[in-house]
Amino acid sequence: MPYDRRQAKSILTDIGMDFNSYHACPNDCILFRHEYRDTTECPKCGKSRYRQDVQGDRVPAKVFPIIPRIRTMFKCKRIASLMHWHKNSRSTDNVMRVPADSPAWKHIEEKWEDFKSEPCNIRFGLAMDGVNPFGLCSSTWSTWPICLVNYNLPPWLAIKKGHILLSLIVLGKYKVKSMDVYLQPLVGATL
């Protein structure tokens, strides 16, 4: 067990589980990253990046880079061999049992033939839900974990604790107005 936060972060970094923090506009217009990294006001709405009062502090969103975690999955021979399950091992009796049997999946495969032709291309499902970590109805604190479910894996593994990837945590004292801006780092990494 690590002795403190710094040592814990060092251990996580060594195994490819590092994270990045990004400040967000108070109106959820942009993340202050890339070209906006050094700006102090939102270019869309003009709001200051920093609040003057102590009551409304926003904690930066924590983004967990997904590419190192995908590499780790493919380094494990057992998991790497199961990444083809949706292509090679699922039943073909036209009964919908897993997402790969759905009309939406079939539509995606018809629309993007190149994506379909490579069975190692990863199909992710996005799961997110706001929670109140302190269990108080009157609390204004909001926590939004955003997870990815790997639909390439068999269904009995895809939703197991070790295979769901936490990709982003949005923390703050207020409900998020628009989640799209927070998904930009994830979408950018996976395309």
Question: What residue ranges belong to the model's regions?
Answer:
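Long, charged/polar, flexible scaffold/linker tracts and peripheral helical/loop segments
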Residues: 1-191
